[in-house]
């Protein structure tokens, strides 16, 4: 087994190297498993790996997983869609690969009832500013989920305006920024807990 995953805030292993490892391993072994966190078809660069395998005439099977957005929502008890509150969901990332043109991710995310931002924790200040500039309200509830579905999972509830504060939390694991009124209950619970701790002194 060989780990080829990236780390939060650090450069991931070069994708071409991963593609080569896959092809080389498939030529050497009868069965090779490329295990990914979440679902490979959502921000998993699966298409590049599939293309490499197809170019090498190597048969493959993609087994779907549970993307971290759904795992985080289930863990928090906060559905991404809610009757009368959230009917549209956008999955987006502010990160742009080398040589890629920037996308209007913020405009798409701000116009949705619920937005889930992948790979944005290291750019929290920029994410908040971009969403607010695109029309999102400053008091929009935000739920930040680190290491969703893992034993060391952690959630931080705050408003969009407060999002830059997550820089103080020492986040190191894979993190989602989930934005929208669907997370109002999580924000209210966090505020009540903060008041309770303040009252206890």
Model-flagged regions — what are they?
Residues 1, 20, 77-83, 134, ...:
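Short, hinge-like loop/turn segments at secondary-structure boundaries
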Residues 1-63, 162-164, 169:
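Class I S-adenosyl-L-methionine
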Residues 2-3, 62, 82, 90-93, ...:
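Structural signal for conserved beta-strand scaffold positions within catalytic alpha/beta enzyme cores
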Residues 4-11, 66-68, 87-88, 94-96, ...:
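Short, acidic/turn-prone active-site loops that include or flank metal/cofactor-
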Residues 17, 27-33, 45, 51, ...:
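A contiguous loop/helix-start segment that scaffolds small-molecule binding in enzyme catalytic cores
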Residues 39-43, 68, 122-123:
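Gly/Ser/Thr-rich loops at beta-strand to alpha-helix junctions
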Residues 51-72, 83-90:
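Short, acidic/small-residue loops that bind anionic groups at enzyme active sites
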Residues 70-77, 153:
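Glycine-rich, charge-decorated loop segments at or immediately adjacent to ligand/cofactor-binding or catalytic sites
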């Amino acid at each position: 087994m060989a780990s080829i995953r990236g780390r939060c805030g650090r450069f991931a292993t070069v994708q071409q190297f991963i593609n080569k490892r896959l092809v080389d391993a498939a030529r050497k072994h009868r069965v090779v498993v490329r295990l990914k966190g979440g679902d490979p078809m959502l921000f998993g660069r699966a298409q590049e790996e599939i293309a490499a395998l197809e170019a090498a005439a190597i048969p493959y099977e993609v087994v779907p997983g549970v993307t971290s957005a759904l795992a985080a929502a289930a863990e928090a008890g906060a559905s991404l869609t809610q009757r009368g509150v959230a009917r549209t969901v956008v999955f987006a990332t502010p990160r742009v690969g080398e040589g890629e043109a920037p996308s209007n991710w913020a405009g798409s995310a701000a116009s949705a009832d619920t937005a889930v931002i992948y790979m944005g924790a290291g750019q929290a200040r920029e994410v908040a500013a971009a969403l607010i500039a695109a029309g999102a309200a400053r008091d929009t509830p935000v739920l930040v989920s680190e290491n969703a579905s893992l034993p060391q999972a952690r959630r931080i509830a705050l408003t969009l305006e407060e999002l830059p504060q997550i820089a103080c939390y020492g986040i190191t694991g894979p993190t989602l920024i989930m934005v929208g009124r669907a997370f109002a209950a999580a924000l209210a619970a966090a505020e009540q807990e903060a008041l309770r701790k303040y009252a206890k002194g």
